[in-house]
């Protein structure tokens, strides 16, 4: 095993702009060098530090229309409210699968959670801002989803529409199949619909570091592609290897 030392990262901002999408800013703070255990040698300067936080800025040049896929979930709902509060036009798309799984498992939230209709009505009452809710199964209603895209013409989609529990994904054969079919099918349909619509839509997909495994690298996980030295001295540029520990992580 070779110990590879990644250079320290200095504080900087990553700013991406588009004529159809407002600025996205990510802050990265200074970090100490990181030791990474690897069965091969990493070369070049392609080892990048992970970005700990990405934040959507205030609307520039008017509000944007944002689809929040899976917007009824624990992360999707506050994200939808945050974007609405910033002045964006938000459309929540959700099939309420999280609630259905809770019923299946005989579980419930520590605090009562109202229906999506009540939630958006309360948000309107409290803030005067409209959030639209559409009940839709993204995995199985592709044509309807494509029509919604063509009708609403969103600038951005934030994608939370996936079965989100690693333990549930390993519970039995049915939950394994559901996790794979739902998570991969929903993501594939979202990407296909964007392409088929012909619209300039940005997709933000929420993942997990568990794709690369927990506690295996001994340090920061390099982002994206890395240069490696293969046995025999041959160099190759590869995507950082995945090491998922569950069906859920393998779909992310």
Tell me what each language-model feature is.
Residues 9-12, 51-55:
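Short acidic, low-complexity intrinsically disordered linear motifs used
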Residues 1-44:
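N-terminal chloroplast transit peptides
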Residues 47-49:
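Intrinsically disordered, low-complexity terminal segments enriched in Ser/Thr
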Residues 4-6, 51, 60:
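Generic extreme N-terminus detector
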């Amino acid at each position: 095993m070779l110990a590879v030392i990644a250079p320290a990262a200095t504080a900087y901002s990553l700013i991406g702009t588009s004529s159809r999408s407002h600025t996205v800013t990510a802050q990265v703070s200074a970090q100490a060098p990181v030791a990474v255990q690897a069965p091969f040698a990493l070369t070049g300067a392609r080892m990048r530090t992970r970005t700990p936080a990405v934040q959507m800025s205030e609307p520039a040049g008017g509000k944007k229309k944002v689809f929040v896929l899976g917007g009824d979930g624990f992360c999707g709902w506050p994200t939808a409210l945050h974007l609405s509060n910033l002045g964006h036009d938000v459309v929540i798309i959700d099939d309420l699968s999280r609630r259905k799984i809770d019923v299946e498992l005989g579980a419930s939230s520590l605090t009562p959670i109202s229906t999506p209709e009540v939630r958006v009505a309360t948000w309107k009452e409290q803030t005067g801002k409209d959030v639209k809710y559409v009940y839709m199964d993204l995995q199985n209603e592709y044509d309807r989803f494509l029509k919604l895209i063509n009708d609403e013409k969103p600038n951005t989609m934030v994608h939370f529409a996936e079965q989100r529990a690693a333990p549930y994904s390993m519970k039995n054969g049915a939950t394994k199949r559901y996790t794979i079919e739902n998570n991969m099918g929903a993501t594939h349909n979202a990407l296909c619909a964007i392409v088929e619509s012909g619209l300039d839509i940005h997709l933000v997909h929420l993942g997990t570091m568990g794709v690369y495994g927990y506690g295996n690298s001994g340090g920061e996980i390099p982002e994206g592609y890395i240069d490696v030295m293969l046995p025999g001295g041959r160099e190759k540029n590869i995507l950082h290897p995945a090491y998922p520990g569950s069906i859920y992580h393998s779909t992310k």
